[in-house]
Amino acid sequence: MNFIKEFREFAMRGNVVDMAIGVIIGSAFGKIVSSLVSDIFTPVLGILTGGIDFKDMKFVLAQAQGDVPAVTLNYGLFIQNVIDFIIIAFAIFMMIKVINKVRKPEEKKTAPKAETLLTEIRDLLKNK
């Protein structure tokens, strides 16, 4: 029972719950960005590059033989994934900038001046 109680306390801490929510939202956001890239950006890029479909861009290393499929390097899909990453990284960067701007800056505690410290020390010594 002690193990379950410890796990429950760990799982219900604010940071763990926040992280779990972030992972879920991030996963959904990743799917949206992937769709944006594959369904909107790459077709437009294909038109601009002469009708090239990025999904079909690949190097054939070994031709298909019978039931064995061809061995290919799918660099077109890799390009799509790089575009996905760049968009997601940029969106996260912008969100962090906004969060940091909105977050209340912590007030810096200024160290007392030397004169103030000396005065306090003098007063403490007088009281002894």
Curated annotation (Swiss-Prot):
Disulfide bond sites: none
Keyword Metal-binding on entry: no
Matches recorded under InterPro entries: Mechanosensitive_channel_CS, MS_channel, MSC/AndL, MscL_channel
Keyword Cell membrane tagged: yes
Pfam short name (any one): MscL
UniProt subcellular location: Cell inner membrane
Alphabetically ordered keywords of this record: Cell inner membrane, Cell membrane, Ion channel, Ion transport, Membrane, Transmembrane, Transmembrane helix, Transport
CC annotations in GO: plasma membrane
SUPFAM superfamilies: Gated mechanosensitive channel
Bilayer topology term: Multi-pass membrane protein
Annotated PROSITE patterns: MSCL
MF (Gene Ontology): mechanosensitive monoatomic ion channel activity
Transmembrane segments: 10-30, 76-96
Subunit: Homopentamer.
HAMAP family: MscL
Protein task: Channel that opens in response to stretch forces in the membrane lipid bilayer. May participate in the regulation of osmotic pressure changes within the cell.
Family membership noted in the UniProt record: Belongs to the MscL family.
Record's protein name: Large-conductance mechanosensitive channel
The species this protein was found in: Haemophilus influenzae (strain PittGG)
